[in-house]
Structures are given as structure tokens and as C-alpha cells.
Amino acid sequence: MAWDKSAFDRKVGELAQPWLRRALLAFFVVVTAALVYSATQLKVDAGFNKMVPLEHEYMRTFTEYQKTFGGANRVLVALRVKGADGDIYTPEFMRALKSATDDVFFIPGVDRATVTSLFTPNVRFIEVIEEGFAGGNVVPASFRGTPADLEIVRQNVLKSGNVGRLVANDFRGALIRAELLEADPASGKRLNYRAVANQLEAVRGKYQSDRIDVHIIGFAKAVGDITDGAIGVLAFFALAFVITTILLYVYKRSLPLTALALVAALMPVVWLLGLLPILGYGIDPMSILVPFLIFSIGVSHAVQMTNVWTQETQLGHDGQTAALNAFLKLFIPGSVALICNALGFLVIMHIKIDVVRELGITASLGVALMILTNKILLPVMLSYLPATPGPVQPVADRFDPVWRAISAFAEPRFAVVALLVATLFLGIGSWKARDLKTGDLGKGIPELHDDSRYNRDNLAIVDSFSIGVDVLSVIVQTKDVQGACTDFAIMDTIDRFEFYMRNVHGVQSVLALPGVAKVISSGWNEGSLKWRALSRNPDVLAQSVTPVDTATGLLNTDCSAMQVLVFTRDHQGTTIAHIVKEVKKFASTNNTPQIEFKLASGNVGVMAATNEAVDAAEVTMLLALFGAITLLCLLTFRSWEAVLCIILPLMLVSILCNALMATLGIGLKVSTLPVIALGVGVGVDYGIYLYEQIKHHMEDQGESLREAYYQALRDRGTAAVFTAVTMGIGVGTWAFSALKFQADMGILLAFMFVVNMLGAIFVLPALAAFLVGPRARAGAGRDAGPTHAG
């Protein structure tokens, strides 16, 4: 049975009673007050596990061996001598290094067993002397900072093999390395990364001087810096609010209409922020932009509603009747558009990363709330306005010549031009989009600008040391082998892997058990380089392996698993993909029933898993998104022609967005993949609103396609252009954000908002000219030009 719109209209008219309007207003006021209070309980909620795809095969390996070999949540604090002269072997520097090591050790959330520096007892040296072996802590317990003590430490550092690891290659810096727990051991709650970052910053403030520089990198410090930058989002929200208010007033020329539109746009934001603590969610720095997106979408729909209300009052209706008619005209297409928005947010939940799923949940919830606030509350508030709230000039009349000209694209002769231009853009976009890369494309972390303190620290550490925070951990798992560390075949395979990876482009250094064992073997034989090899004799091999403690992270207690640490020059997506490909290539030819090379741990392993998850999700996400929108449009308009007219421009803009990302050097990653879904979800509004009016004028008024499109532009086009430009300007201000990922999202969203609007205005009617026009001409028997609808 077909849906009866006239019956729906009559039923709504019967319900539009004064008591119901007052009850609805009271309900919204009470709920808003309660949710405002709840929003005060909202907290920033960031976590390492939320940022990674825990279901990915690499992450299963990571989780399995996290307690044995440590995780990827590492912090590096580097102290470096300032100036052109000098090195670390001074009393002043050593005092600072020891004190800083103690401060890092006592930061809540630090896994104290993993703290490593020249002053920790897990950093030792072994040397060959006439009597055999000698060794001890690199910095002896008797160290007092005398010249003799400093010379002893200098020699011990060289003997320990820590140059490039804990001591800079030029001897002008030293590292403190530590790993963080996921939960605070004191409270048992999730670790507060911002608090850890603040304490690390306090370490910097304490030891930074005119003689010493302090550099800090690691996940916790990155989260802290991103959170600090995210607070600046509030300033951009305020700026966008001011810009929107000014543009709304210029557009509406009415203070009451401007105020009501802003209230309706802000209401779902307030409700969303209030519901998050109730549902057990916080707000992650990566999704702190969602409230602004909800506000932008709210403005778009509020402008459409107030626009139709104004048109109704100009036809002579009183405020209440105008509000009712506006509700009847926009509730169905507006709700369908909002559901499409929500689907755009929901499909990104296909990416199995908690922070992305939370973004999808919060954004779709905000859009769902908009059906209540924009489609129900706003008409109720409008019903209390008088028919002439201010000097409202018909905006459509001002743009009438423009709409007359653009309506020509609904005729085949002009539609061909629009479609040829669209095809040209499609070809250029498809060609350029092939250059889009997955993952990070710059040095440092992409969430912050290249000149940020964090990325400058990262560059300083990478330039000074042979290792950085970027490490790929490959786990070598043995099966049914007793004492794998003394099995020559096993150790030789790992040794060959170590050599193979050391020669892979993008690898900075490699550390594995066989390499260490060969050095020890040489030590047992008076340091002879001829003995720097793996012995085939298990007893001799055992002698070389025994001194290597499990605390090094190179082997577990029974030697059933060994870790190969591959330090990378950077963590660009292309670098990671190449290194992972080489690991898989070696594993495919060397895995046996006794030995298996398993990816991956370390922060680069986490990035590899994330990049692969994003790469795998892109096509599926877009198919699900366009499939869902297609189904909704088909159910709404009962026409495949309508579906194609609405969907094809969106697909074109999605391809152009990928091309823009490739051109600007923005990689496809967790923070940018949702932009395409969000842009499509928001962009479908324009097509639905315009096509709904085209359908209405053709079927109910019997008008030609061009005349119907002209009327649709007068009714909906002005509001569509205004909202696209307003949202584009609002998110465009993000380009000046301290957060690079926010700046990237701002540029991409501004592009999506504006170009989706242009696609709906120019490409949609051109498609309709060939898909809908012939059928309409056959049915109506006419092709009239536009006339002024006064």
C-alpha cells in the first residue's frame, strides 16, 4: 500500500494544537536544562588502545607478546648539549641526566621495569680482559662526577654498544627510555595521558637551560600536545558561530529568525554533549570536531526551514499556519537527508578502530537528535512569530536572474556542456587520485604541524640517534624446538633476516639476538673478529646466548619467541608498506614448521595495522555509504532516475576529494578517511532538497523539467548556496588551527561542502535532462521555458 501524504498532512494538522505546542516547548526546555548539567561532567578521553585496530592480525601478535616484550606505548626523553662544543661527559650533564631519569621513573603510569638510561642498572657492559670477562653497570655505583669517573663512563659506554641507542652518535646527547602502562596502577583507571604529558613537560621545564636542550617524544606526549591544541578548537567554534550569525542576519534581515535558526542549530550540540557522559563516553581529541560538524549541519537545515516559513508568510499565511506548512513540506525530505547524514557517519564504524567507531556513534547520534530539534522544535518556535518578523526581503527575487540562467542546464543542449565538464573533471580527478597514499606522508606525527615542538623534538632525536620512537618489532616464534636459542638453523635464519632487513630502504638499524650473540662469541675469543659468527656447536652457541638477559627484550624466558627490532627512518605510509612487504617476502620463503616470522609489534607495527585497516575499509565504506543512500532515495522518490541524479554528483565529488588529498600531500588515514563519508552524508542534502522540489513541481503542478528546476532553485537553491558557503567558511577557518589534522579536515570539508553544492546545482539537472526529461516531455507533451513565479 502506497504512503498517503495527504492523510499524513491532515493528521499533523489535527495535532497542531496550542496545548501540544506548549507541551513540546516545556519538554525541550526541561530536557535541555538536564543535558546542560550533564555536559558539565564531560571529560577528555584518550587512550592508546582506542587508536589501534585491535582485531587486526598484527595487533593480535602485539597483544599476545605485549607483556613479554613490551608494547608500542613508549616515551623517549633526550637531553642534548647546546652549542657547537662539548659532550655529555661533564658533571653538570650527568647530574641532569641522573635526576631526569629519577623524575621519569616516578611519573605515575610509567612501567618502572622498562625505564632505561645510562643510570639504570639494566644498562651494563661486558669486556674481555686477560683473566676472562669483566663487566658491570655503565655508570658505576661509585660515580661522583670526577674527571676519572667521567672517563670510566666514557669507556664503558663504548664497551656497552649503546652509542646510537642511549648515547647520541656524536656523544652530545643521551636518552631516557620508558614504556607506559594502559592503566594507572594507583587508581586502576585508564591512564590520563594529558597528565603524563604535563609531567613530562615539567621535566623539560626543570632541565632545559642555556647549556642543555630537552626533547620529548612518544604517544603520551603526542596526545598531550594534541589535547592542548584541541582546546583551541573552542576558539574556532566561537569564530564560526560569529561568522554564521553575521551571515545569517545578512541573509535573513531578521533578528528573530536568525536567533531561532541558531538556537535550533546549537540545541543538538548541547544535547549530544549532555548525552555522552550518560552513555559512558568522553570526548576524544580526534573527535572533538564533531560538535562543530553537527552545528554546521544544523544551520543548513535551520536555514531551509526558516526559508520556507518566510515564503509561506509572503503568501499571506499567519505565523502558525506558515510554520505548519513549513513542517509539512520539509519534514519528510529533511528527515531523509538527516538519515543519510547519519548513515554517512555510521558507515565509518566499519573501520575497526575504537576512536573511529566513537566518532561514528557521536556524530550519528547528533544528527538523529537534529530530527527532533530542527524538524519539530524549530517549527514550534516559528509558530509563535508574527507573520512579519522584520523587514524580510524575498531573497529568491534577488537571485532570480541567476536561477533563470542556471535552469537552462535542465535542457539537453546546455546539459551536454555541464556533463562534458563533469566528465573532464572526472578524468582529471581519477588520474590524480591514483597518487593518493595510505598513512602518514610527512615526518613526525601528522596531527601536528611540521614546526610544532613535538615534531622538532622528533627530528632532533632521529638525527642524533640510530634509533627513535619508530620501531617495527617482528616476533620469531618457534614450534616444537627445545632451546631454540642454541639451535644453529633457527639462529642462522634469524641472522639472515637481520642482515636482509638492514639492507631494506627506510630501515635505520636492526637489533636481534644473533647479532648480539656474535659479539659475545668474539668476546669469548679475545675479541677476534674471526669469531664474530654463530657456532654450529650448541654448547658454544649457548655460551654466546646465556649472557643476554630477557630484560633486553630480544628473547623470552624459554627462548620459544625472539624479537627482532627494526628501527625505521620515519613512519611515512609508503616507508611502512615497503618494509612490511619485505618482511612478508622473507617470511614467505623462510617460514617452516619449526619457525615463523610474525608481524608485528612496536609503534610502526601498530601503524602498519592501522594503515591496512584503513586501506581495507575505504572501498567497503564507500560502497556501504552509497548503497544505503541509494536505498533511501529509492524508497523516498520511487525512481531510479532520481537515485542516479542524486548519487552520481556525490560520487564525482568523492573522486575529486581523493585527488585534492593527493595534490595537497594528505594521506588516507584514521583522521581523513571519515571526511569523505561526512562530506557525502552532508552533501546529499542539496540533491534531496532540490530533487524533491523538482518532483513536486513536475508531478503536482504539471510543469516542464526546466520550469520545475527553476522553481526548485527559487525555493531551495538560495538556501543551499548560503549554507554551503557558510559551512565552507566556517570549516575553512580550521586551516589556521594549531592541529594539522584539523587544518586538513577543514580544507577537505570546505571543499566537499561547496563542490557538492555545485554538483547538485549544475550536474543534477544535466543528468535529469536526459534521465527524467524525455519521460516528462512524453507525458506532458511540452517543454516550456521558465516564467517568473510571483
What residues fall within each predicted segment?
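Signature of alpha-helical transmembrane segments and their immediate interfacial
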Residues: M1-A46, V380, Q393-K443, R456-L459, ...
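Helix-loop junctions and hydrophobic alpha-helical segments within the transmembrane domains
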Residues: E312-I339, M698-F722
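Interfacial segments of transmembrane alpha-helices in multi-pass membrane proteins
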Residues: D228-I283, H350-D354, M621-G665, F736
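Extracytoplasmic
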Residues: R95, F143-L255, L266, D492-D495, ...
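Hydrophobic transmembrane alpha-helices and their membrane-interface caps
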Residues: L257-M305, E641-Y691, G732, G759-V763, ...
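Hydrophobic, glycine/alanine-rich multi-pass transmembrane helices and their short helix-loop junctions
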Residues: L247, L276, S335-L377, L382-S383, ...
